[in-house]
């Protein structure tokens, strides 16, 4: 699997990736954790609280655990995010290999 930088794909990049055996996986809108936004305006706790309110079943999450635009890396929020989602009844699984080999994710 692969994720296009910025989530931007074209028909050509998707064809090229498929020819190389890759399936593009895009994150869900609620799955953008905001961790590339400036820390002074979007502190980790605010991003964590927003994620815990917004994420729904089946969402694919995307996080940069350390990025130049943040003075406070988001990585320390990963454990509270997973714990909070589990406390809300979420489960975590590996992506099924069979659906990836067919070039799509099964729902």
What name fits each language-model region?
Residues 44-53, 75-83:
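Amphipathic, non-transmembrane alpha-helical secondary structure
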Residues 69-107:
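C-terminal domain-boundary segment and adjacent tail
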């Amino acid at each position: 699997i692969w994720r296009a930088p910025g989530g931007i794909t074209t028909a050509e990049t998707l064809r090229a990736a498929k020819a190389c055996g890759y399936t593009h996986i895009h994150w869900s809108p609620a799955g953008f954790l905001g961790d590339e936004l400036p820390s002074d305006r979007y502190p980790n706790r605010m991003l964590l609280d927003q994620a815990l309110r917004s994420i729904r079943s089946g969402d694919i999450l995307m996080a940069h655990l350390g990025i130049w635009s943040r003075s406070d890396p988001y990585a320390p929020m990963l454990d509270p995010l997973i714990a909070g989602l589990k406390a809300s009844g979420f489960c975590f699984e590996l992506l099924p290999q069979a659906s990836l080999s067919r070039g799509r994710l099964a729902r």
